[in-house]
UniProtKB/Swiss-Prot annotation:
The gene is panC. It comes from Chloroflexus aurantiacus (strain ATCC 29366 / DSM 635 / J-10-fl). GO terms for biological process: pantothenate biosynthetic process. ATP binds at residues 26-33, 143-146, 172, 180-183. Beta-alanine binds at residue 57. Homodimer. This is Pantothenate synthetase. Belongs to the pantothenate synthetase family. Keywords: ATP-binding, Cytoplasm, Ligase, Nucleotide-binding, Pantothenate biosynthesis. Pathway: Cofactor biosynthesis; (R)-pantothenate biosynthesis; (R)-pantothenate from (R)-pantoate and beta-alanine: step 1/1. It catalyses: (R)-pantoate + beta-alanine + ATP = (R)-pantothenate + AMP + diphosphate + H(+).
Length: 281
């Protein structure tokens, strides 16, 4: 496994491979990340992973400085998983002095995480576009847990004619339903016990949908009701949106819907989602 820190180093190492799978991460890896690596390993003869805590996707009052980092542990996990190349650039390597070009999707900034975290998806789209240009992957793997990110990346690839196939991998969960996240490490014991309420709220609404409910506001109310039963949970938003446009729905049609939410437990903010398949899909 080669560990590379500059664009020039990576491009030189990349030249040894024809087909390459790629998993972009911010490090502090968990089984959700490793599930992406495992799928990449199954589908591609070589796999690259990036570790870069991207400052441009964090807001001024967010957790960039304290975002968990453990590079040695990450490298041991990636070596054991059979990764070929690891790209760990510095902030200066990715954003040199005078950097001034960004990828912006105005529609993404108006809904869900984009509305709650101004500028977040400008940072996400820009860094992913840069990584695609540096890594030149055949396929790139993303988790369904960050549902809006997958929509943003897919649209960017389509709009900018980027020659990479995007593969979405199902969310990996703890036995009690909590979606794996690097931010789960922030939860104290009481908050950790309360956190599966996100999964329960989503599952309850999904069960109502499976039983025939198609009114979106009814499903929002179902999710809010479950969340209200957990005193530590403070919802940021609860959404029933079109799975491609992420616009809020009045009624769920043939395309199905994305159930999603962001919930705070004191200073810890967790997100989760559940994709409702459309009729006949």
């Amino acid at each position: 496994m080669k560990v590379l820190h500059t664009v020039a180093e990576f491009r030189q190492a990349r030249a040894a491979f024809d087909v390459l799978g790629f998993v972009p991460t911010m490090g502090y890896l968990h089984q959700g990340h490793l599930a992406l690596v495992e799928q990449a390993r199954r589908e591609c003869p070589a796999v690259a992973v990036s570790i870069f805590v991207n400052p441009t996707q964090f807001g001024p009052n967010e957790d960039y400085a304290r975002y968990p980092r453990d590079t040695n542990r990450d490298l041991a996990l990636l070596e054991a998983a059979g990764v070929d190349l690891v790209f760990i650039p510095s902030v200066e390597e990715m954003y040199p002095p005078g950097f001034g070009t960004y990828v912006i999707q105005p529609a993404a900034d108006e809904v869900l995480e984009g509305a709650a975290r101004p500028g977040h998806f400008r940072g996400v789209a820009t860094v992913v576009c840069k990584l695609f240009n540096i890594v030149q992957p055949t396929k790139s793997y993303f988790g369904q847990k960050d549902a809006q990110q997958t929509v943003v990346v897919r649209q960017m690839v389509r709009d900018l004619n980027l020659p990479v196939e995007i593969v979405i991998v199902p969310t990996v969960r703890e036995p009690d339903g909590l979606a794996l996240s690097s931010r789960n490490v922030y939860l104290n014991a009481e908050q950790r016990a309360a956190a599966p309420v996100l999964y329960r709220a989503l599952r309850t609404a999904a069960e109502r949908y499976a039983a025939g409910e198609r009114d979106a506001e009814t499903l929002r109310a179902v999710m809010r009701s479950v969340l209200a039963g957990e005193p530590l949970a403070r919802p940021d938003y609860v959404s029933v949106a079109h799975p491609l446009t992420l616009r809020e729905l009045d009624r769920i049609g043939a395309d199905g819907a994305l159930l999603s939410m962001a919930v705070r437990f004191d200073q810890v903010r967790l997100i989760d989602n559940w994709l409702l398949e459309g009729e006949g899909k």
